[in-house]
């Protein structure tokens, strides 16, 4: 009896996907819930597992094919896995009897690319890691992104791949754009072509918020089991600024302006596959600890490729922190259909004038890119001034002033 392999439901409003990679070929034995393939949507990569024990009977859609939800992409001949495995074992025993023993130690076989997810293989290659020395914690011992990232943080755990002199043919690598990368490219270009994007800047003295964090970070972590970062301060300050300037939390829908009375804040996260913006829902109803936990959870899921469509959908305003990469100044691009995005940057000590005296202070440039069709210049400037006021006086955030 054959069992169909079909494209699963991909979330609300998502009807198409692309087959990223098959991990099995026709004739391979499989067990229930064993990984068969990965498919990519516009925002996430999803795994498709075997619905039963058996053998791959047919693969009707190969790597790179565009497929629809519910479409048949292959078949499993049910119940044949055990028999196939038994045959393979007998064959292996026969070979063991007839093959002469070599005096030279057999080298440990290299991990073949096709048992690594594309994103994992890319990360391994970019960091020149030997996958044989990475302990896999995924299903059936598969290496996950988290395993690779942990290895990168403890470099002694993996042996670097020796540098090889490349031929002229190997100096250029042509790689098909992933569905996520194509979506990012299209959305950013659409944003530039549709919105009247304008960027305004300000700078913040981070002295007080740094002092407050340093004073309470250990006590905060001990009580809430999460580290106190700066992003929670900026999320809370952003919400207060959005309440003051409602147009920044609005969007254009045809001939209508839609003002949103809720605050779902997107926080941009860079991954090896590209930039994603998971959403912290109803952030205005959260305390600092809840915001930090939500951001930490979403960032971890993003790095491991486990974000769901629900994690990425919606959002009324976004925050992007280029400072973690060392950026001093940038003009972030609006994430449509939102009307604004806040850009944070690297905190750097600079000479500033305080009460007529030159002092060294930790300063950060902030930027607001906004859609000038809906937000006036005065509103954009006032929005940043409010954030500056709250971050430079963090007690106002704590006292809800």
Swiss-Prot record:
Origin superkingdom: Bacteria
Cofactors demanded by this protein: (R)-lipoate
Catalytic activity: N(6)-[(R)-dihydrolipoyl]-L-lysyl-[protein] + succinyl-CoA = N(6)-[(R)-S(8)-succinyldihydrolipoyl]-L-lysyl-[protein] + CoA
Gene3D superfamilies, alphabetized: 2.40.50.100, Chloramphenicol acetyltransferase-like domain (3.30.559.10), E3-binding domain (4.10.320.10)
GO CC term, one of those recorded: oxoglutarate dehydrogenase complex
Cited SUPFAM superfamilies: CoA-dependent acyltransferases, Peripheral subunit-binding domain of 2-oxo acid dehydrogenase complex, Single hybrid motif
Keywords: Acyltransferase, Lipoyl, Transferase, Tricarboxylic acid cycle
Classification via InterPro entries: 2-oxoA_DH_lipoyl-BS, 2-oxoacid_dehydrogenase, 2-oxoacid_DH_actylTfrase, Biotin_lipoyl, CAT-like_dom_sf, E3-bd_dom_sf, PSBD, Single_hybrid_motif
Residue ranges annotated for the Lipoyl-binding domain, each copy included: 2-77
EC number: 2.3.1.61
Keyword Acyltransferase: yes
Pathway: Amino-acid degradation; L-lysine degradation via saccharopine pathway; glutaryl-CoA from L-lysine: step 6/6
Role of this protein: E2 component of the 2-oxoglutarate dehydrogenase (OGDH) complex which catalyzes the second step in the conversion of 2-oxoglutarate to succinyl-CoA and CO(2).
Protein name, UniProt field: Dihydrolipoyllysine-residue succinyltransferase component of 2-oxoglutarate dehydrogenase complex
Provenance organism: Rickettsia felis (strain ATCC VR-1525 / URRWXCal2)
């Amino acid at each position: 009896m054959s069992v169909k392999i079909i494209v699963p439901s991909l979330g609300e409003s998502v009807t198409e996907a692309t087959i990223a990679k098959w991990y099995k070929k026709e004739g391979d034995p499989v067990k229930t819930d064993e990984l068969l393939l990965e498919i990519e949507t516009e925002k996430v990569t999803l795994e498709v597992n075997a619905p039963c024990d058996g053998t791959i009977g047919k693969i009707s859609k190969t790597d790179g094919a565009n497929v629809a939800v519910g479409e048949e992409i292959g078949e499993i001949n049910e119940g044949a896995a055990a028999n196939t495995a038994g045959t393979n074992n007998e064959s292996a025993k026969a070979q063991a009897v007839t093959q002469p023993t070599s005096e030279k130690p057999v080298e440990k076989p290299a991990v073949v690319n096709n048992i690594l997810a594309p994103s994992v293989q890319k990360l391994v290659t970019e960091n020149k890691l030997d996958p044989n020395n990475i302990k896999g914690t995924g299903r059936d011992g598969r290496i996950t992104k988290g395993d690779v990232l942990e290895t990168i943080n403890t470099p002694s755990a993996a042996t670097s791949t020796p540098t090889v002199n490349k031929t002229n043919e190997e100096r250029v690598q042509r790689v098909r754009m992933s569905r996520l990368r194509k979506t990012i490219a299209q959305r950013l270009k659409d944003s530039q072509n549709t919105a009247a994007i304008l960027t305004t800047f300000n700078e913040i003295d981070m002295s007080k918020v740094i002092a407050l964090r340093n004073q309470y970070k250990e006590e905060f972590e001990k009580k809430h089991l999460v580290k106190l970062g700066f992003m929670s301060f900026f999320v809370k300050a952003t919400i207060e600024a959005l309440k003051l300037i409602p147009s920044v939390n609005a969007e254009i829908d045809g001939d209508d302006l839609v003002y949103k009375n809720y605050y779902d804040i997107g926080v941009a996260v860079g991954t090896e596959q590209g930039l994603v913006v998971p959403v912290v829902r109803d952030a205005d109803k959260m305390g600092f600890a809840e915001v930090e936990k939500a951001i930490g959870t979403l960032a971890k899921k993003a790095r491991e490729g486990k974000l769901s469509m629900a994690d990425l959908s919606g959002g009324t305003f976004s925050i992007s922190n280029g400072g973690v990469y060392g950026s001093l100044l940038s003009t972030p691009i609006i994430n449509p259909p939102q009307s604004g995005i806040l850009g944070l940057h690297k905190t750097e000590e600079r000479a500033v004038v305080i009460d007529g005296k030159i002092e060294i202070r930790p300063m950060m440039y902030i930027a607001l890119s906004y859609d000038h069709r809906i937000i006036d210049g005065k509103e954009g400037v006032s929005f940043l001034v409010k954030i500056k006021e709250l971050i430079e006086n963090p007690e106002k955030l704590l006292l809800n002033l």
